[in-house]
């Protein structure tokens, strides 16, 4: 809002609080969607890893390494989905914190 240390009127504070509440509400949907995407990617990775492991030949270590190498793209998708969820979650928490700060001004 005001970056120059100009005092805010009660109306400005109330408008900012309303804006934060709306952003938090939208953020809940974003977090839920991102988490569902992460869970989908995590299941896909687990499934691909298990299939690659079972199809591989050799010792246990050899099979693990082959499965790991073959499933790197799925792991990357899972990691990207995890990062997106964590980012949305941190943003949601930051907005919630800002809302608490603004409410304490009122």
What is each model feature region?
Residues 31-63:
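Extended alpha-helical coiled-coil "stalk/arm" regions
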Residues 13, 17-20, 49, 67, ...:
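Generic structural signal of hydrophobic/aromatic residues within well-ordered alpha-helices
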Residues 1-27:
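Short, charge-rich amphipathic alpha-helices with coiled-coil/heptad character
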Residues 105-106:
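Conserved small/polar residues in nucleotide/adenosyl-binding loops
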Residues 20, 24-27, 31-34, 38-41, ...:
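Amphipathic alpha-helical coiled-coil segments
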Residues 2, 9, 63, 80, ...:
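Sparse, context-dependent recognition of short Cys/His-centered cofactor- or disulfide-binding micro-motifs
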Residues 57-84:
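Short, glycine/alanine-rich amphipathic alpha-helical segment
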């Amino acid at each position: 809002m005001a970056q120059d240390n100009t005092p805010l009127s009660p109306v400005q504070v109330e408008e900012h609080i309303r804006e934060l509440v709306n952003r938090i509400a939208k953020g809940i949907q974003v977090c839920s969607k991102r988490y569902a995407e992460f869970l989908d990617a995590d299941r896909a990775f687990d499934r691909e890893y298990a299939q690659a492991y079972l199809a591989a030949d050799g010792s246990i270590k050899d099979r693990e390494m082959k499965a790991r190498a073959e499933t790197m793209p799925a792991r990357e998708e899972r990691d990207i989905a995890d990062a997106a969820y964590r980012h949305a979650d941190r943003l949601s928490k930051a907005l919630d914190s800002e809302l608490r700060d603004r409410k304490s001004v009122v």
